[in-house]
């Protein structure tokens, strides 16, 4: 029998597949399986929270329009029965408009950290991101930090 910790590790590996896969229908199938429909996601790209797997994927799709070769690589994770702390490496080339910034052609490589909270049904119900978006905005000249 699989432990809850092993289940949560498998969820995060499947989540990596969800955000990196190029087939939208497959991504949406995985999003429905992995993300609670009422899970709120806060992001600088929207003044209101985005909800559920479709909300989460809308951020992925925005990133893909702005960085056509965007990839997220799961570098490390620490998992318990209720959450997963994940370090991602995000790479891509800024070749589309991003938050009002015209394409620069700059390549980005950013380390991002997220905490994912997983309910008893094995669905992500909360995502708390560290400074990841700042790491994207800074090399594009969208923030002066």
Outline where the language-model segments fall.
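Short acidic-aromatic low-complexity motifs
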Residues: 2-38
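A solvent-exposed, acidic/Ser-Thr-rich amphipathic alpha-helical stretch
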Residues: 28-84, 89-91
